[in-house]
């Protein structure tokens, strides 16, 4: 089996259906005997350039280990789903399990906010 990194962008009006789409796509990979090493929902983000007059999209990242047939099936599902604006499937040399740069930055921001909240409460109490 080979390792793949998959990123797909969903129409912002379809953000509510992203969880179902992720479940469907991961299900098709696991049914074919593949495994999901990393799954990150980056949420709605600004795009670098407009696509179909849209400036935002819902981003999802998956790192999987699967056979080529399952990846072909997934690519076909992306192609026929109108809600998927763009997708990218790259073959990688090994499984990537650590958080991506996007998620690391998000975790750092939330940690800073959590650290700042007790300090603000202490300053208000004095």
From Swiss-Prot:
InterPro entries: Ribosomal_bS6, Ribosomal_bS6_sf, Ribosomal_S6_plastid/chlpt, Transl_elong_EF1B/ribsomal_bS6. It comes from the Bacteria. The keyword Ribosomal protein applies. GO terms for cellular component: cytosolic small ribosomal subunit. Residues 101-126 are annotated as: Disordered. GO terms for molecular function: small ribosomal subunit rRNA binding; structural constituent of ribosome. Keywords: Ribonucleoprotein, Ribosomal protein, RNA-binding, rRNA-binding. Residues 104-126 have a biased composition (Basic and acidic residues). One of its GO terms (biological process) is translation. It holds the Pfam family Ribosomal_S6. Binds together with bS18 to 16S ribosomal RNA. Belongs to the bacterial ribosomal protein bS6 family. This is Small ribosomal subunit protein bS6. It comes from Aliivibrio salmonicida (strain LFI1238). The lineage of its organism: Bacteria, Pseudomonadati, Pseudomonadota, Gammaproteobacteria, Vibrionales.
């Amino acid at each position: 089996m080979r390792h793949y990194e998959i990123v797909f962008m969903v129409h912002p009006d379809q953000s509510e259906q992203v969880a179902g789409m992720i479940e469907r796509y991961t299900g098709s990979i696991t049914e074919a005997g593949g495994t999901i090493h990393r799954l990150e929902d980056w949420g709605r983000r600004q795009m670098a350039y407009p696509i179909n007059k849209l400036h935002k999209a819902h981003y999802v990242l998956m790192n999987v280990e699967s056979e080529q047939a399952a990846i072909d099936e997934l690519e076909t599902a992306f192609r026929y789903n109108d809600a998927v604006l763009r997708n990218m499937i790259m073959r990688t040399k090994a499984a990537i399990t650590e958080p991506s740069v996007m998620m690391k930055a998000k975790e750092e921001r939330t940690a800073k906010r959590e650290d700042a909240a007790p300090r603000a409460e202490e300053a208000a109490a004095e």
